[in-house]
Each structure stands twice: as C-alpha cells, then as structure tokens.
C-alpha cells in the first residue's frame, strides 16, 4: 500500500520539510509516503472563501490516486489514539488499495471532498497550522507502522 498525503497550502518552511522528510524516509520500509501540495485558493479582501475552498476541492479530487481509499482529516472526524491509528492502518492495508490522506485549506474541505472520503479522521480539537499537521500525520503514520511491525519506537 502506498500513501499519498494531499495537502492544501503553500510550500512548507524548511524545518517542517526536514521533519516530514525524516518520517517519510523512516516510513518507507513499511509504506511509501508521497506528499502532494495543492495550491490554495485565492483569499482576502473582497474574495469569496467558499469559492476558494471549492477550487481547492477540485484540485484535491484531481490529485487522488485511482481507486484509493480516501481519508479526510477533519476536525469533526473520528479521533484516534496512536493504537487505534495502527488498527486503522491494518484495516487500510487490508483494503488492497492505495491510501489518500487529505489535509484541507483554512476553511477545511469542500463538500465534494468530504463526500468522496470513505472516512474522516480528527487529530484533535486544537487548531493547528496546516504545515504542522503534515509533520504530525507523518510521525503518527510512522508510529502506527512501527507498532504493527513490533518496532520499539512506540513506548506507551
């Protein structure tokens, strides 16, 4: 199973990119992780935020791998502990399809993106910079894969 993390937003600062690359490298033993950056919609004075979100949504949907199992990261989604994420990863692997994880823009995902998702995952009620979410997701995917492989990384 390959995983494509589709994230709406600008290019990440170097410290985020370095952290993401580190977990991407570690995770490659168990699951290739690809980052696809989606250009954010135009926002600002006199601009319609919903139109920007819908534009982003169209670009996200176009970036989905064919027949992928789609999981949208969304605040009202299902919260998962690290152990529960490992169980979900095992389930996703059992689907026999690639995985697409979606990180939305400032207003979240468009209705079309949420409709396309097989499930939604909440990493918690905190408001986090979307760049940081990329790094958190990469680390948690690595942690879940390490747990499934009985690797000593996870010590809870």
Swiss-Prot record:
<dbReference type="InterPro" id="IPR029028">
    <property type="entry name" value="Alpha/beta_knot_MTases"/>
</dbReference>
<keyword id="KW-0698">rRNA processing</keyword>
<feature type="binding site">
    <location>
        <position position="104"/>
    </location>
    <ligand>
        <name>S-adenosyl-L-methionine</name>
    </ligand>
</feature>
<protein>
    <recommendedName>
        <fullName>Ribosomal RNA large subunit methyltransferase H</fullName>
        <ecNumber>2.1.1.177</ecNumber>
    </recommendedName>
</protein>
<dbReference type="Pfam" id="PF02590">
    <property type="entry name" value="SPOUT_MTase"/>
</dbReference>
<dbReference type="InterPro" id="IPR029026">
    <property type="entry name" value="tRNA_m1G_MTases_N"/>
</dbReference>
<comment type="similarity">
    <text>Belongs to the RNA methyltransferase RlmH family.</text>
</comment>
<comment type="function">
    <text>Specifically methylates the pseudouridine at position 1915 (m3Psi1915) in 23S rRNA.</text>
</comment>
<keyword id="KW-0949">S-adenosyl-L-methionine</keyword>
<feature type="binding site">
    <location>
        <position position="73"/>
    </location>
    <ligand>
        <name>S-adenosyl-L-methionine</name>
    </ligand>
</feature>
<dbReference type="GO" id="GO:0070038">
    <property type="term" value="F:rRNA (pseudouridine-N3-)-methyltransferase activity"/>
</dbReference>
<dbReference type="GO" id="GO:0005737">
    <property type="term" value="C:cytoplasm"/>
</dbReference>
<keyword id="KW-0808">Transferase</keyword>
<keyword id="KW-0963">Cytoplasm</keyword>
<keyword id="KW-0489">Methyltransferase</keyword>
<feature type="binding site">
    <location>
        <begin position="123"/>
        <end position="128"/>
    </location>
    <ligand>
        <name>S-adenosyl-L-methionine</name>
    </ligand>
</feature>
<dbReference type="InterPro" id="IPR003742">
    <property type="entry name" value="RlmH-like"/>
</dbReference>
<comment type="subunit">
    <text>Homodimer.</text>
</comment>
């Amino acid at each position: 199973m390959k995983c494509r993390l589709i994230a709406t937003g600008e290019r990440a600062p170097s410290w985020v990119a370095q952290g993401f690359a580190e977990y991407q490298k570690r995770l490659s033993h168990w699951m290739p992780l690809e980052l696809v950056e989606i250009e954010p919609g135009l926002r600002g004075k006199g601009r319609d935020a919903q139109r920007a979100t819908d534009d982003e949504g169209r670009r996200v949907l176009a970036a989905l791998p064919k027949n992928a199992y789609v999981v949208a990261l969304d605040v009202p989604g299902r919260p998962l502990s690290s152990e529960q994420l490992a169980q979900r990863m095992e389930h996703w692997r059992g689907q026999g399809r690639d995985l697409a994880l979606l990180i939305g823009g400032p207003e979240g995902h468009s209705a079309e993106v949420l409709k396309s998702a097989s499930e939604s995952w909440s990493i918690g009620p905190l408001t986090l910079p979307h760049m940081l979410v990329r790094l958190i997701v990469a680390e948690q995917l690595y942690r879940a894969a390490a747990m499934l492989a009985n690797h000593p990384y996870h010590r809870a």
